Amino acid sequence: MHLTSREQEKLMLFLAGELAAKRKARGVKLNYPETVAYIASHLQEAARDGVSVAEVMQYGSTLLTVDDVMEGVAEMVHEVQIEATFPDGTKLVTVHNPIR
């Protein structure tokens, strides 16, 4: 199987997001890379499921709270931006201040 660079990046993002989800489920507070991966991977999956761009952006701000992340991480994550594959093509999705 040959994966393009873009496909490799998507796969790495998915794996990092899965690891972050497992840690969150165990009650471990997420660090910066885990936080971004968790949000980004959930956004990718929502887009792939056919959710609209606006709904994906709104969904991104409901995934984590300040209680889910390590101290200071919420202030560091001003936005999460991904290129997501929707049924009608690839689009840029930006979630501003995703941790509330």
UniProtKB/Swiss-Prot annotation:
Domain of life: Bacteria
Localization: Cytoplasm
Keywords: Cytoplasm, Hydrolase
Assigned EC number: 3.5.1.5
Listed GO biological process terms: urea catabolic process
InterPro entries listed in its UniProt record: Urease_gamma, Urease_gamma/gamma-beta_su, Urease_gamma_sf, Urease_subunit
Pathways per UniProt: Nitrogen metabolism; urea degradation; CO(2) and NH(3) from urea (urease route): step 1/1
Reaction catalysis annotation: urea + 2 H2O + H(+) = hydrogencarbonate + 2 NH4(+)
A Pfam entry, by short name: Urease_gamma
GO MF, any single term: nickel cation binding
Cellular component, GO, one term: cytoplasm
Subunit composition and interactions: Heterotrimer of UreA (gamma), UreB (beta) and UreC (alpha) subunits. Three heterotrimers associate to form the active enzyme.
Family membership noted in the UniProt record: Belongs to the urease gamma subunit family.
Protein name per the record: Urease subunit gamma
